[in-house]
Curated annotation (Swiss-Prot):
<dbReference type="InterPro" id="IPR006297">
    <property type="entry name" value="EF-4"/>
</dbReference>
<dbReference type="InterPro" id="IPR000795">
    <property type="entry name" value="T_Tr_GTP-bd_dom"/>
</dbReference>
<feature type="binding site">
    <location>
        <begin position="27"/>
        <end position="32"/>
    </location>
    <ligand>
        <name>GTP</name>
    </ligand>
</feature>
<dbReference type="Pfam" id="PF00679">
    <property type="entry name" value="EFG_C"/>
</dbReference>
<protein>
    <recommendedName>
        <fullName>Elongation factor 4</fullName>
        <ecNumber>3.6.5.n1</ecNumber>
    </recommendedName>
</protein>
<dbReference type="Pfam" id="PF00009">
    <property type="entry name" value="GTP_EFTU"/>
</dbReference>
<feature type="domain" description="tr-type G">
    <location>
        <begin position="15"/>
        <end position="197"/>
    </location>
</feature>
<keyword id="KW-0378">Hydrolase</keyword>
<dbReference type="InterPro" id="IPR000640">
    <property type="entry name" value="EFG_V-like"/>
</dbReference>
<dbReference type="GO" id="GO:0003746">
    <property type="term" value="F:translation elongation factor activity"/>
</dbReference>
<keyword id="KW-0472">Membrane</keyword>
<keyword id="KW-1003">Cell membrane</keyword>
<dbReference type="GO" id="GO:0043022">
    <property type="term" value="F:ribosome binding"/>
</dbReference>
<dbReference type="InterPro" id="IPR035654">
    <property type="entry name" value="LepA_IV"/>
</dbReference>
<keyword id="KW-0342">GTP-binding</keyword>
<dbReference type="GO" id="GO:0003924">
    <property type="term" value="F:GTPase activity"/>
</dbReference>
<dbReference type="Pfam" id="PF06421">
    <property type="entry name" value="LepA_C"/>
</dbReference>
Length: 610
């Protein structure tokens, strides 16, 4: 039986502290393992326990994924009777949330590499593990789900050694579901993961590893004390801005919020200091005391730039201010979310937002709609292009409607990503066909015992929309994907403008690879013809490249039968009525506006269908 105790402050020896992350692929059991550690170490009573304790967002529980990094502090008494203070951080596994993983690793000395013993190593496991190795974090391999009948721990241990290249034959074998092997795991954490380095007597240095906004308390920051001690009521300084604040509250999560009067060197906890401005405590910044400030900032994790961009517009204009405030609060929670105001003739006022991937975009949109009750229209996602103009100037653009005239452009370069795909060998042919269809170039192919590791360079524009879905489809769900930006490469792209009755609709302007331009244009034009309601006059829909129409369709007018009351008589009377109607339609077309409902844009701009 585990000898675990409820949290009580009093561990003054840094050698008794262990800070570690749990990194793994989606659905390999990291959140369940976190729950088991909390339950067995007395963090919560049986009544307070629920599945996925650390996945606090409803979206996380619904999708069965972890989005935000969560921290917990528990105490453990080992077999020798010594008390150890364990701080662990549950991290996401999806490729779009890798920045959360790097953030957690910056606060740790060790990481549990959790691998499902029924599935083996996945591409994202590989990426996260290499990130941990680059950050000099001690890796402890853990083979989970050994209680399942199809578990093959020996095979998976060999896979870890072959593919990742770290020793794994003595990896901890456990079941987060039943609790088997958890005691051995905790002992391994204590023995293998090094204690924090730092000096309790040095000036305070605290790394902000996460922040979120509380409607009542303001900004709450999760911090790791690298040097010194932080006391309640201390006057602290944010080193990047030089601004000073008084500490109102400090404490730890057990996972319940527990107030303390100090945080010591090596510990991970939360801090509230009355910050109301959501950009005043940026993630990755360093806190120090105003009285005795540290000389240097802590070198934190690499700040990750957005990979894709899309326009977000409220369905009704009266929600704009609420939308702006909501984005401000979400951006504090999410260091990679970028946004700036954007104005569209068709969609009104909104924001141009930067995301790490399509899932990241969907999560942000879902949170805005659910937590803030804002109905949104999202434009088709695009990537950043490097453009060299005729005059030699180089610019970077992500908005198709802002692209200069094609005659002024010398070279367009698109971002290329290196995709690492792990799959069983039987799906290799289908995956290679898919990569070729997406304009991919094969870099490497390595056969391991039961899996093949494929490396392809593919344009990011092809990857961000539905490549992941198609990959899962052709591999029956077995293939996994991880990608990383490599370089810009010249490409022949064209800008397609959509015109309705000769008026350009900026929200529908897209960039396309020149060979796909005709089919994409025809697809959008045909879709619009079905969705736009008929008017009293003809509506022409055109797709245009450099003033040349490459696709066109016409929505025929609604036409009243003006001859319904003419039962006979002179034919000139009928001609006169028809001519009068024709002249009226001409006048109406000149002065009439085409009413395009916003629901039409919602349907056309659906990224999955586009």
């Amino acid at each position: 039986m585990l000898k675990c105790i409820k949290h009580e402050y009093g561990i003054k020896n840094m050698k008794s502290i262990r800070n570690f992350s749990i990194i793994a692929h989606i659905d390999h059991g990291k959140s369940t393992l976190s729950d088991r550690l909390i339950q067995l170490c007395g963090g919560l009573s049986e009544r307070e326990m629920s599945n996925q304790v650390l996945d606090s967002m409803d979206l996380e529980k619904e999708r069965g994924i972890t989005i935000k990094a969560q921290s917990v502090m528990i105490d453990y008494k080992n077999k020798s009777g010594n008390i150890f203070n364990l701080n662990f951080i549950d991290t996401p596994g999806h490729v779009d949330f890798s920045y959360e993983v790097s953030r957690s690793l910056a606060a740790c000395e060790g990481a549990l590499l959790v691998v499902d013993s029924t599935q083996g190593v996945e591409a994202q496991t590989l990426a996260n593990c290499y990130t941990a190795i680059d950050m000099n974090v001690e890796i402890v391999p853990v083979l989970n789900k050994i209680d399942l009948p199809n578990s093959n721990a020996d095979k998976v241990a060999k896979e870890i050694e072959d593919i990742i290249g770290i020793p794994a034959l003595d990896a901890i074998r456990c079941s987060a579901k039943t609790g088997e092997g958890i005691e051995d795991l905790i002992e391994r954490i204590i023995n293998d993961i090094p204690y924090p380095k730092g000096s309790i007597n040095s000036p305070l240095q605290a790394l902000i590893i996460d922040s979120w906004f509380d409607n009542y308390l303001g900004v709450v920051s999760l911090i790791r004390i690298k040097n010194g001690i932080l006391f309640e009521r201390d006057k602290i300084q944010v080193m990047s801005t030089g601004k000073n604040y008084y500490v109102d509250q400090i404490g730890v999560f057990t996972p319940k919020k527990l107030n303390k009067n100090q945080l010591r060197c090596g510990e991970v906890g939360w801090i509230i200091c009355g910050i109301k401005n959501i950009i005043a405590a940026p993630v990755g910044d360093t806190l120090t005391t105003a009285k005795n400030p540290a000389k240097n900032m802590i070198i934190g994790f690499k700040k990750i730039k957005p990979q894709i961009y899309a326009g977000l517009f409220p369905l009704t204009s009266d929600q704009y201010e609420m939308f702006r405030d909501a984005l401000g609060k979400l951006s504090l929670n999410d260091a990679s979310l970028f946004y700036e105001p954007e104005n569209s003739v068709a969609l009104g006022f909104g924001f141009r937002c930067g995301f790490l991937g399509v899932l990241h975009m969907e999560i942000i949109q879902a949170r805005l709609e659910r937590e803030y009750s804002i109905d949104l229209i999202t434009t088709i996602p695009t990537v950043i292009y490097e453009i060299e103009l005729i005059n030699g100037k180089i610019i970077y653009l992500d908005t198709p409607s802002n692209f200069p005239n094609m005659n002024d452009i010398k070279i367009i370069k698109e971002p290329i990503v290196e995709c690492s795909i792990l799959s069983p060998p039987q799906f290799l042919g289908s995956i290679i066909k898919l990569c070729i269809k997406k304009r991919g170039v094969q870099i490497n192919m390595v056969y391991h015992s039961h899996q093949v590791l494929l490396k392809y360079n593919i344009p990011m524009n092809e990857v961000i929309l539905n490549f992941f879905d198609e990959l899962k489809s052709v591999s029956s769900g077995y293939a996994s994907l991880e990608y990383d930006f490599k370089y810009f490469q010249s490409v022949k792209m064209v800008r397609i403008d959509i015109l309705i009755n000769s008026e350009k609709v900026d929200a529908l302007t897209i960039l396309s690879y020149h060979k796909n331009a005709q089919s994409r244009s025809r697809e959008i034009v045909d879709k619009m013809k079905k969705l736009i309601p008929r008017h009293q006059f003809d509506i022409s829909i055109q797709a245009v490249i450099n003033n040349s129409v490459i696709a066109r369709s016409t929505i025929k007018q609604l036409r009243k039968n003006v001859l319904s009351k003419c039962y006979g008589g002179d034919v000139s009377r009928k001609k006169k009525l028809l001519q009068k109607q024709k002249d009226g339609k001409k006048r109406m077309k000149k002065i009439g506006n085409v009413n395009v409902p916003k629901t039409v844009f919602l349907s056309i701009l659906n990224s999955r269908e586009s």
